[in-house]
Design a protein with these regions (language model features):
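Membrane-embedded, hydrophobic transmembrane alpha-helices
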Residues: 1-87
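Active-site lumenal/periplasmic loops and adjacent helix-entry segments of GT-C-fold
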Residues: 98-205
Length: 205
């Protein structure tokens, strides 16, 4: 829980700068893009050099947040920062809320039909208020297994977790990124990958 709180604070801190931009939407996009690039680079580099540990990730994030805030305040005139109140885009806000609730209920409060791998074609079961915290689809299980392998081995996700054999991973960037976020926030990917999935899919929507 402590790792989660610290991680969320450090992830949210750079977004405070969005309130300083005259065009706050553009500022938010800039900051969000910076965070994606930074965490992806941090994941790949630390895993490549075998130093993919929580202490390293935490230290890098603390340093990055400090440098970003210091650099932004130093160059505030160049970027025309403004302390005007943030105007909420209610349409985007409502869409985000609906998206989160819709995706959340699939895993944590699902009512409807479902089938399983060993069921016959068009054979369905009924569920009411069902809670299933694990990944649903094969690609999600695939991502979880490789990301956990990266965390456990402190290296790039290039080994088959079933037999420890090397293979070319075409989704190495995504799996490295997921592993870094999970390590940074102290998440158990087996039971909490769905939370990351909800967040990512909400952004895509």
């Amino acid at each position: 829980m402590i790792k989660l709180i610290i991680g969320l604070i450090l992830l949210a801190a750079p977004f405070l700068l969005a309130a300083l931009f005259k065009d706050k939407k553009r500022g938010f996009i800039y900051i969000f893009f910076f965070l994606i690039v930074f965490h992806t680079f941090l994941a790949l580099s630390t895993q490549f050099f075998g130093i993919f540990y929580y202490s390293v990730i935490l230290g890098a994030n603390l340093l990055a947040v400090f440098l970003l805030l210091a650099w932004s305040l130093k160059n505030k005139e160049k970027f025309q920062f403004s302390f005007q109140p943030v105007k909420i885009d209610w349409f985007i806000f409502i869409v985000a809320i609906i998206s989160v609730l819709s995706l959340y209920q699939i895993h944590y409060n699902y009512t409807g039909k479902f089938n399983m791998v060993n069921d016959a074609l068009y054979q369905y079961h009924e569920a009411k208020n069902m809670k299933y915290v694990y990944p649903y689809f094969s690609d999600e299980w695939y991502a979880v297994s490789l990301a956990k392998e990266a965390i456990n081995s402190n290296s790039l996700p290039l080994k088959n977790p079933f037999d420890n054999s090397f293979f070319i991973n075409p989704e190495i960037v995504f799996h490295s990124f997921i592993a870094e976020i999970a390590l940074f926030l102290g998440l158990d990917l087996l039971t909490q990958y769905t939370l990351l999935s909800i967040f990512i899919n909400t952004l895509l929507i």
